[in-house]
């Protein structure tokens, strides 16, 4: 499975000591390259002020560097605590258009239990491209990244007590 192969590569990079931010960028790169119909791929990190902030991404620049929880597909995914697969973004009332070319969007939360760390956001210029296989791949990578966020949080907390 493609998601497993991407996670194996992320495991290797992690064992080699790749910094956390570079692991996020590598995950974005691998996901983006995994499907020619993924036209914009990025990670938005959730901060304590309930704002999503854009992290590493591949694709056209976007004005949506900050997104409030509840706003657009990305903010709604966090507010509703669920992944969202939108086959046709024109049907979404509160859609935030990053590009007029975007036709479909997939948002997968990076979470451990109830704690949401971030999300993977993927846009496509084609309608209804996020089939079960694509969603499964992105979910697998999101699960791996959730573990990385958890390890980072634990390491940072332990370092603060030292």
Which residues are covered by each model-predicted region?
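Intrinsically disordered, low-complexity terminal regulatory regions
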Residues: 1-62, 140, 148-162
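Short loop/turn motifs at secondary-structure junctions and domain boundaries
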Residues: 35, 97-102
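Short hydrophobic/aromatic beta-strand element in the GNAT-like acyltransferase core
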Residues: 40, 107, 119
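Regulatory sensory and allosteric helical modules in signal-transduction proteins
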Residues: 46-97
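A short, aliphatic-rich beta-strand micro-motif
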Residues: 104-111
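Glycine-rich acetyl-CoA-binding "A-motif" of GNAT/NAT acetyltransferases
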Residues: 116
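Amphipathic alpha-helical "output/dimerization" segments
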Residues: 130-150
């Amino acid at each position: 499975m493609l998601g497993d192969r991407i996670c194996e590569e992320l495991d290797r990079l992690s064992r080699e000591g790749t910094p956390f931010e570079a692991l996020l960028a590598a995950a974005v790169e691998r996901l983006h390259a995994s499907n020619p119909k993924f036209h914009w791929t990025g990670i938005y990190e959730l901060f304590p002020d309930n704002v999503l902030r854009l992290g590493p991404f591949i694709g056209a620049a976007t004005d949506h560097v900050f997104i409030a929880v509840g706003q657009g597909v990305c903010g709604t995914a966090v507010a509703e605590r669920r992944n969202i697969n939108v086959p046709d973004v024109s049907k979404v009332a509160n859609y935030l258009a990053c590009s007029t070319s975007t036709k479909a969007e997939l948002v997968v939360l990076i979470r451990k239990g109830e704690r949401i760390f971030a999300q993977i956001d993927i846009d496509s210029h084609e309608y209804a491209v996020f089939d079960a296989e694509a969603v499964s791949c992105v979910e697998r990578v999101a699960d791996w990244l959730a573990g990385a966020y958890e390890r980072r949080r634990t390491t940072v907390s332990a370092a603060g007590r030292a």
